[in-house]
């Protein structure tokens, strides 16, 4: 029981410490929400819509599998 209480207090303390010492230069949360709202209003500005994929026959990355339509086999999109 004591160990459980100590663990709860420790977690609460560490959480409070993290929020108290977090670097919030330039009001990061406000900028984050502002950018997300702008991207919802203008989907073309969204970074998520920029797809950097390779066409068939182009060199590709085996780890990222960055081919548009097929698979990356021996560093070439199929």
From Swiss-Prot:
UniProt keyword terms in alphabetical order: Cleavage on pair of basic residues, Disulfide bond, Ion channel impairing toxin, Knottin, Neurotoxin, Secreted, Signal, Toxin, Voltage-gated sodium channel impairing toxin
Tissue expression notes: Expressed by the venom duct.
Entry GO MF terms: sodium channel inhibitor activity; toxin activity
SUPFAM superfamilies the UniProt entry points to: omega toxin-like
Signal peptide (UniProt feature, chain positions): 1-22
A Pfam family reported for this protein in Swiss-Prot or TrEMBL: Conotoxin
Reported function: Delta-conotoxins bind to site 6 of voltage-gated sodium channels (Nav) and inhibit the inactivation process.
Domain-level remarks: The presence of a 'disulfide through disulfide knot' structurally defines this protein as a knottin.
Name the record gives this protein: Delta-conotoxin-like TxMKLT1-0111
């Amino acid at each position: 029981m004591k160990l459980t209480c100590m663990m709860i207090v420790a977690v609460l303390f560490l959480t409070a410490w993290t929020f108290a010492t977090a670097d919030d230069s330039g009001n990061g949360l406000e900028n984050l929400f502002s950018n997300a709202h702008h991207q919802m209003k203008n989907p073309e500005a969204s970074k998520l819509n920029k797809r950097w994929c390779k066409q068939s026959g182009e060199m590709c990355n085996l780890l990222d599998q960055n081919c548009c339509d097929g698979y990356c086999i021996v560093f070439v999109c199929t």
